[in-house]
Amino acid sequence: MSHPAFCGVSRQHLGDLLEELQPKWRARCEGGRHARRGGARQRQLGAGPKYQLTFHDRLVITLVHLRTGLTQEALAAAYRVSSSTISRTIGEVRPILAERGFAVPDRPGLRLRTLQDVFAYASAEGVDLCLDGAETQVRRPKAGRPGRQAFVSGKRKQNTIKTTTVSDHQGRLLFSGAQRPGRMHDQTAVRTEGIAEQFRRYPQVSAKVDSGYRGLAGEFPDQVTAPPKKPKDDACEGEMRAWREARRRQSSARICVEHANAELRQWAPMRRFTGRRDTYDQTHRAIAGLISDRAAQRPTRHQHSTELVLANDTTR
């Protein structure tokens, strides 16, 4: 089960996660026992029932569940334990993975956990950001439940949850989260998530967005670049060609964030989430943090310009 095809991470990455997360898991478990006891332990250290699974097994089980969407019953049969043990294992390890945040390229040990952290990092390092929204299909709520229509996406005509993805110009994931119901438009999320406020606080940060964030580009024309509006039907051929070329260059510059979203969809729960809706945010952040670890290891390369350059100087 520890093979990368099952757990989605390399063996080196798995070893790093074991070293990083095992102390946090032990502290979390001991804190829970202390709260249940209402005080310090009464018996000697090591007394009481022993764990059926080591932390290595627990981490691998959680990674396999996140990567493949394998059911808890199937994992219980593979490890010869009960389904409740698997459920408790995932419930203990998944929050620790979700709390890790997002790795930063060329900055080992530094993690980003909020949109404010991302904008502060981009401002300090001069990083150009790319923003996009992502949708994940979720289960349909029961009939008669309040707010049932809030999750029906106008684009996909399905029950979805939307999130915001932020990457650099190489498609390396810097942030993914800020979940919202699928019916909410991207421009509405700009106001509710505080993205517009971050652009006001960091006027030197620039970003490339799609047409869903065109209102943000209108509010911050010097910072945000969105696809140009299509000319009217009676526009001349030259104007239409100029519009198509401008749209192509802008799309080419921001395609990297689409690649970051594609990396997320390689994990089964990000294609269709079948679990409880209140655990989606935790699952999403855990998966996105693991993807950012791998993306941060990609070396930084020079950002090529998409501007047109004349092949011959015609001014002479």
Region locations from a protein language model:
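Residue-level marker of regulatory loop/turn positions in helix-turn-helix DNA-binding domains and
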Residues: 53-54, 249
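Short helix-loop boundary/capping segments at the starts of domains
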Residues: 23-27, 67, 92-95, 99
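Short, amphipathic alpha-helical "recognition" segments used to contact nucleic acids or chromatin
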Residues: 54-69
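Charged, often Cys/His-bearing segments associated with DNA-binding zinc-finger transcription factors
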Residues: 1-53, 215, 299-308, 313-316
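Short, well-ordered secondary-structure "scaffold" segments embedded in the functional core
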Residues: 74-98, 102-316
